[in-house]
Amino acid sequence: MFIPVIMAGGSGSRLWPLSRSAFPKQFLSLDSSSQHTMLQATIERLQGLPIAEPIVISNEDHRFIVAEQIRRYGKKSRIILEPAGRNTAPAIALAAFTAIEQEDDPVLLVLAADHFVKNKSAFQAAISQAAQQAEAGKLATFGIVPTTPETGYGYIHRGEEVTQGTYEINSFVEKPQLNIAEQYLASGEYYWNSGCFMFKASVFLNELKQHSPEIYRQCELAMQGLSHDYDFIRVGVEEFLKCPDDSIDYAVMEHTKLGVVVSMDAGWSDVGSWSALWEVSDKDADGNVCQGDAILSGTSNCYIYAPNKLVAAVGLKDIVVVETKDAVLVADKNQVQEVKKIVEHLKAENRAEYREHRERYRPWGKSDAIDKGERYKVNRITVEPGKKQSLQMHYHRAEHWVVVSGTAKVTCEGNVKVITENQSLYIPIGTNHMIENPGKIPLELIEIQSGSYLNEDDVVRFEDK
């Protein structure tokens, strides 16, 4: 039995406008053949293997999204919250320390939450092969059999064969120029670096202590400040912030004598761009990938994503069109790496479209800002069963609530009232109020805010529950 360690950090900025800093690609459903998000799919493709409860590494901003997606998938997990991003070596170290505290030196399978794998059986076969190496005290990494001279991936140069499909590691190679990548592909001796690993927790920590002692030390100190908060595991903030920022490749794998690479040919992709997503998606006879409501005429090799509005495309070739509730991307499929520049521009201007979608997820449910104008704003709010918002008050706005479905238990200036479908309630300016869903189905209501100042910082509240 082994423990999956799922790294759920990262911003996925090249998949904007679908992926945003507050809701990046690992939490999206990008596979047209599945309803699972990428995080859920990462867990799903392990089904049938002898796995223990996963450890998921996330951050404060995404903690409720992680917890809710795993809950909806029907699994339990341990969620470690990093105080700040410090790359993969410290993150994996926290997971290894956590695993050793709770189990007797388990084998860890380290995976990214935002990868795509087409062939589940080939993926699991490679894991079984790597597990044998891990049990023998090796640090196994997965090398992806390359299909193109990709310049966006790092490479692993394999050495002598250890067993069939498993090799010693000669070297790790940075992202190459095209002519070098073509040589790598022709040689048959190089793999794409997947960034996924399998090893015993103790073996990894011993090698980390030897080759990157400062990372080991700061993570060990951070674990001494460990605390539990509902589903979450928090570590000492000050100690972790002193930890060097380094990848597992630089911190351990390039130095260890215990490394091996296991060959994997499973239709893997890190889905790092819209063109990469087009590559791995099912296509129609004209090479188009369509999700949502799209009508095409004379169009080929395009990616069309239209979940909210009808998108009509005429005479297009090699174009990406992505429609969301508050932004639309139109791009040449061969230049989609430049989307990152758009994201940088949005960030510099502090645009909301950089940070989050119009529909925003909260600890208690979600809120969709469906309309706004001079002195008013309209939200469609969903409160999950058993959840409630914090007790709060606003200085500049009043609120009108109309229940669409479900039952609301409202506390207003200490008075409790239950309202149901087609009933409404008025919350005056300066009134303490709280809404709760005591029922068994989601509570949906329309909230109309009115007043002279409608920004989110006009709120005095306790912590969301």
Swiss-Prot record:
A single BP term in Gene Ontology: GDP-mannose biosynthetic process
Pfam families: ManC_GMP_beta-helix (PF22640), MannoseP_isomer (PF01050), NTP_transferase (PF00483)
Domain of life assignment: Bacteria
A GO term, aspect molecular function: GTP binding
Enzyme class: transferase
Catalytic reaction list: alpha-D-mannose 1-phosphate + GTP + H(+) = GDP-alpha-D-mannose + diphosphate
Keywords: GTP-binding, Lipopolysaccharide biosynthesis, Nucleotide-binding, Nucleotidyltransferase, Transferase
Pathway: Nucleotide-sugar biosynthesis; GDP-alpha-D-mannose biosynthesis; GDP-alpha-D-mannose from alpha-D-mannose 1-phosphate (GTP route): step 1/1; Bacterial outer membrane biogenesis; LPS O-antigen biosynthesis
Enzyme nomenclature, EC number: 2.7.7.13
NCBIfam families according to UniProt: GMP_PMI
Family as reported in the entry's similarity comment: Belongs to the mannose-6-phosphate isomerase type 2 family.
Full protein name: Putative mannose-1-phosphate guanylyltransferase
Protein's gene: rfbA
